[in-house]
Amino acid sequence: HPQFLAKLFFQEVPEIFEGVIEVKSVARDPGSRAKISVHTEDSTIDPVGACVGMRGSRVQAVVNELQGEKIDIVTWSDNQATFLANALAPAEVSKIFLYEEKNKVEVVIPDEQLSLAIGRKGQNVKLASNLTNLEIDILTEEEESERRQIEFKEKSSLLTEVLDVEDVIAQLLVTEGYVSVDSIASETLENIEKIEGFDNDLA
């Protein structure tokens, strides 16, 4: 049970026992690996360092109690993106796209970090998901770049077709953030003329 892990830290870390450090969430794959997020309002205290202890003594006592279960201790944050990046450690995160209404996030990571982010049998991403209470989709930088190119082509070909303009003009418009006919129709002539490569006649 996740609360069992929190209780062990409560026993081993005086700052948790005293209420100076708070255990915010726990995610476990019992017997294998766990993640725990901690937070303190006291800026002079490093909550992760306090839980690890001198030379790892505190966390090691908890690990021994759990027969060698690996434990990641991460800093909790009320900023979802920061907390998520911490939760996915040891993998590095390049970008995070939040879809707040769905409790879902898309995380972009360097290509070579993919196996680290997902973990053995999906363990790292699963624990990070449970810890943050978010559904996590992981993309590599290459996959994200390919997707953006496809989206760019789709948007520019739509404008080419609807506005009956050349490809290069449609691409210019999409690059400037005009991704729909409505967004162009509602824009002033003056602003469209400002786009590099556009003149009064073209606009």
How should these model regions be labeled?
Residues H1-A203:
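RNA-contacting regions in translation and RNA-metabolism proteins
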